[in-house]
Each structure stands twice: as C-alpha cells, then as structure tokens.
Amino acid sequence: MLDESPMRKGDSVSNDQSNPESNASVSIHQQNQIITCVSPGPVCPNAIEIKRDIVIVRLRPVESCPGYRFFRRVFETLEKWQLQVDMFSTSLGRITLALGAAALQAGISDSCSARNDMMSRDLMHGMQKLLPDDHIELFPHMAIISVVGHPSRRMAGHIFATMDANDIPTVMISHDAARLGIACAISEQYTAKALCVFEQCLFRYSLTH
C-alpha cells in the first residue's frame, strides 16, 4: 500500500518521439514535473511501502581487528542500544546498516528532525566506543522504499532503470533471494517523488501496456 497519494490532476501520457529509443520509454507530464518511464516491467508489483526516519550507518573496521571480531562487536553494540536494523550489507569487511528511529527510547520529540538528530547523537555515542570517529559515517534523514511483487529476474533491473531515469539516487539496496521484494534506501527528500514515479511507471504504465 502507498502511504501517501501523489497528485493525479492533469496527468497525460505521450510517447517521446524525439528519443531514438522511443519504443523503450515514455514521458509522463504531471503538473510541473516530467516522469520518465522505461518500457513496461515484466510484472506489475503488488505494493510499494515507505519507511521514514532512517539513519544509515557505515562502519569501517580498524586494520588490526579481524573481521569476525568486528562483526561481533557491532552486533553487541546494536543489542546493547536495542537498535532495530531494517537493512544490512557488507562489502570488503565494511558494514552498512539502516536503523529505524522506532528503536529509540521513549520521550523523544515528535519532530522528525529531532528524532533523527537524537538518534545520531545516541548512536554516535555507542559507536565511538567501538571505532574511531574517522571510521564511522552517519547519514540521517533517510527513508526505505520497498517494492513487493511477483518473482521475476527482470523486476530489479526495471526498478533501478526507472529510478535512474528519474534521478532518484540510492544509498543502499537489498534484494531477497526469492525475488519477491526489493528495498532501497534513499534520502527522505525523494520519497514523494519516488512514490509518484513508481505509481505511474510500475502500476499505471505496466497495467495499461
């Protein structure tokens, strides 16, 4: 389910004849923005979900710490601070986490900005006991957009091509082995645009072509 409905007033769909690959894309004019849809996806997804108030944490181990010990210390810190992990990835010994603000202790302000700022301070305090400052990167004010659909090898490529065509940068990607769900971490400022793009390109355009 979508957690917000983009404006639909004055929508129009037209083939881009000036594009030599016009058979592979269309431009959807919606109010003051143009949405580019690549060719219809293999299967229309079932739902799109957005989760806001996310902080991305990138951790780089010190050279003297073995990978297995670094992993253990990271998860011990997460358990101690009772932080919910929404996404997790590793690359060359580095760890990237997407943490939800819902794991914070009670009494946090209702302000979205205040929640993220408080989480950043609390998290930094916990991580500083684990790593030097220059080994920790925090990216607050992020969101996770998840696309749930039927299994298809082409679904991931179609989604990322759609995001790239509409200049929606991703910070983190998760794709389950069953190919039923794809999740991307994006900046909160892109959530409304991403929902609008996905509704137009993954639902409407796929269903009508």
From Swiss-Prot:
Q: How is it used?
A: Loline alkaloids show broad-spectrum anti-insect activity, and different lolines may have different biological activities. In vitro tests of NFL, NAL, NML, and semisynthetic loline derivatives with long carbon-chain acylations on the 1-amine have shown that many are effective against both fall armyworm larvae and European corn borer larvae, but the effects seem to differ depending on the modifications. N-Formylloline reduces the weight gain of fall armyworms by deterring feeding, and does not significantly affect corn borers.
Q: Which GO terms fall under biological process for this protein?
A: alkaloid metabolic process; homoserine biosynthetic process; lysine biosynthetic process via diaminopimelate
Keywords associated with the record: Alkaloid metabolism
Q: What induces it?
A: Expression is induced in loline alkaloid-producing cultures as well as in planta.
Keyword check for Cell cycle: no
Q: Where is the signal peptide?
A: none
Cite a single GO MF annotation: aspartate kinase activity
Task: Show the InterPro entries listed in the entry.
Answer: ACT-like_dom_sf
**Annotated Basic and acidic residues bias:** 1-11
Family that this chain belongs to: Belongs to the aspartokinase family.
Q: What does this protein's UniProt record list under function?
A: Aspartokinase-like protein; part of the gene cluster that mediates the biosynthesis of loline alkaloids, potent insecticidal agents composed of a pyrrolizidine ring system and an uncommon ether bridge linking carbons 2 and 7. Lolines are structurally differentiated by the various modifications of the L-amino group and include norloline, loline, N-methylloline, N-acetylloline, N-acetylnorloline, and N-formylloline.
Under which name does UniProt file this protein? Aspartate kinase-like protein lolA1
Q: What is the lineage of its organism?
A: Eukaryota, Fungi, Dikarya, Ascomycota, Pezizomycotina
